[in-house]
């Protein structure tokens, strides 16, 4: 703010002294705007006189309420200085004002920027959290999708397996595989090709179909078989009257001689079908859940049996498609360390060398069991005290036993203890493997005693008991041999003694056996 002094006297202010200037300067006090008319007239006259006298100077009379005190005074000069405020941008005060405004703007801008930064930081944190949630949700979805695919695939596999098993069961019930009745269980491949007119179903069960089927079997060497499921197998063990149903159906056809003959044919077919289901049971001590017999198995069922708290597991051979061999595995109720394995059926594929021990053992035992089916139940091989069974398997009664109580003939090989009085390593017919606990049969003794031949199949690279080209002749020879043994006690005793001497290799018994054989031969010559 600048002060500009103004002089109303018209003279130069430089000539005035400071004392004169202070004396001449008059201060305007209060102005009486409500004075009387006389005072106004007097003041106006005085002013006119002053103007007339000094036209070049301006005199201002100081007014006061007390006019008398100021009459003798006259002031020539009045300080009417003006305090002007300029709007120059270059002034100090304007610069201060401008600085304050700029600082306020900067502070406001900084505050806004800080708020924006905070908002952006919060938005980025929310974005990161949403990304994590999205990633976790995606991972959960992928895992659930994989689990769903696995469950669906597992269900499809179970459905496929169930469908395959049902189809196999239906196929086995409808098809009639080619075989020779009452012969050895074949280890070689068998033919599954059957003409449509020779196929039949088990559920029909009508007498004409049974008659037609039995006649086709007798003429074309075919027999009726049916693959058993775990339920039907367990029912078969509990129901000993399963086979006589065929006899009941055959009784409807009675009336004349031809119908009686056909009923006999039906009965014979049922008996042969029953003998076809011969089982070989092996008892061995093992801590493993299953014996290592060299084959590959798949478990398809398990159930509890009466009288045994241990479950019975059912297995099927998976080394070839459609292999009918099955086995049942169950722990002994009296001794849990004994594992009972029951084999049924014959392999239709080549066997590896590791599987030949058990396959040969079970095949020979089943062959011995089936070879005696032409004899009666009283004198046949179904009797545990049969001479032929004791001769072929020269073991103790606990080592090899034959059961006739089950609906299907079963022979049991007990490997839990060695036979009494015989050295297993010196027995040429049955050798017990110390390493695997399996039974190895001497394949050069049993077939010749049973009137059969042993063939070696080089194409399939395994040896087994195969069907001869003339099965009926072999069956007739076996029938003739067994009939001769049953009809001639002396010859039976001589044959038993001879076989015993050959197996044991005893020189002392060999002389006695020769005498007995000579006596038997002379008796036979005399009868002839």
From Swiss-Prot:
GO annotation, biological process: negative regulation of DNA-templated transcription
Family matches, as InterPro entries: WRKY_dom (IPR003657), WRKY_dom_sf (IPR036576), WRKY_plant (IPR044810)
Signal sequence region: none
DNA-binding region: 286-352
Region (Disordered): 1-20, 180-260, 506-528
A Pfam family of this chain: WRKY
MF terms in GO: DNA binding; DNA-binding transcription factor activity; sequence-specific DNA binding
Residue spans of biased composition, Polar residues class: 202-218, 249-260
TM spans (from-to): none
GO cellular component, one term: nucleus
Keyword list, A-Z: DNA-binding, Nucleus, Transcription, Transcription regulation
Annotated function: Transcription factor. Interacts specifically with the W box (5'-(T)TGAC[CT]-3'), a frequently occurring elicitor-responsive cis-acting element. Modulates phosphate homeostasis and Pi translocation by regulating PHO1 expression.
Protein name as it appears in the record: WRKY transcription factor 42
Species of provenance: Arabidopsis thaliana (Mouse-ear cress)
């Amino acid at each position: 703010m600048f002060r500009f002094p103004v002089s109303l006297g018209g003279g130069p202010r430089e000539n005035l002294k400071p004392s004169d200037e202070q004396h001449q300067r008059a201060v305007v006090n209060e102005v009486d705007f409500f004075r009387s008319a006389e005072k106004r007239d007097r003041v106006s006259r005085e002013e006119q006189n002053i103007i007339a006298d000094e036209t070049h100077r301006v005199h201002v009379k100081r007014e006061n309420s007390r006019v008398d005190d100021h009459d003798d005074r006259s002031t020539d000069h009045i300080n009417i200085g003006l305090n002007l405020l300029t709007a120059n941008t270059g002034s100090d005060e304007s610069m201060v004002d401008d600085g304050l405004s700029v600082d306020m703007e900067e502070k406001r801008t900084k505050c806004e920027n800080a708020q924006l930064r905070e908002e952006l930081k919060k938005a980025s944190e929310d974005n990161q959290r949403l990304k994590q949630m999205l990633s976790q949700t995606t991972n959960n979805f992928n895992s659930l999708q994989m689990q769903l695919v696995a469950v669906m695939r597992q269900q499809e596999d179970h459905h496929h397996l169930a469908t395959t098993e049902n189809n196999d069961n239906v196929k086995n019930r409808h098809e009639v595989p080619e075989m020779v009745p009452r012969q050895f269980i074949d280890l070689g491949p068998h033919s599954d090709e059957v003409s449509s007119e020779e196929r039949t179903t088990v559920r029909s069960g009508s007498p004409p179909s049974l008659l037609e089927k039995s006649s086709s079997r007798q003429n074309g060497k075919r027999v009726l078989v049916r693959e058993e499921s775990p339920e039907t197998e367990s029912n078969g063990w509990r129901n000993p009257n399963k086979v006589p149903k065929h006899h009941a159906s055959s009784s409807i056809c009675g009336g004349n001689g031809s119908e009686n003959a056909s009923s006999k044919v039906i009965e014979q077919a049922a008996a042969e079908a029953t003998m076809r289901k011969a089982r070989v049971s092996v008892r061995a001590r093992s801590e493993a859940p299953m014996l290592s017999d060299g084959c590959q198995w798949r478990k398809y069922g398990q159930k509890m049996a009466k009288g045994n708290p241990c479950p019975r597991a059912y297995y099927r051979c998976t080394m070839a498609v459609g292999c009918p061999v099955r086995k049942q595995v169950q722990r002994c109720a009296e001794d849990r360390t004994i594992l009972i394995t029951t084999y049924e059926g014959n392999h239709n594929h080549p066997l590896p060398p590791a599987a030949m021990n058990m396959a040969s053992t079970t095949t020979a035992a089943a062959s011995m069991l089936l070879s005696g089916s032409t004899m009666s139940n009283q004198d046949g091989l179904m009797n545990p005290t049969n001479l032929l069974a004791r001769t072929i398997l020269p073991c103790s009664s606990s080592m090899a036993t034959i059961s006739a109580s089950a609906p299907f003939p079963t022979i049991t090989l007990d490997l839990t203890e060695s036979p009494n009085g015989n050295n297993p390593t010196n027995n040429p017919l049955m050798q017990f493997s110390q390493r695997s606990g399996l039974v190895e049969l001497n394949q050069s003794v049993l077939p010749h005693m049973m009137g059969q031949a042993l063939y070696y199949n080089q194409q399939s690279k395994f040896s087994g008991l195969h069907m001869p080209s003339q099965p009926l002749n072999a069956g007739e020879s076996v029938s003739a041999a067994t009939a001769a043994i049953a009809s001639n006690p002396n010859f039976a005793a001589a044959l038993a003694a001879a076989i015993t001497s050959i197996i044991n290799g005893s020189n002392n018994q060999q002389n006695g056996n020769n005498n007995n054989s000579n006596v038997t031969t002379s008796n036979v010559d005399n009868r002839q």
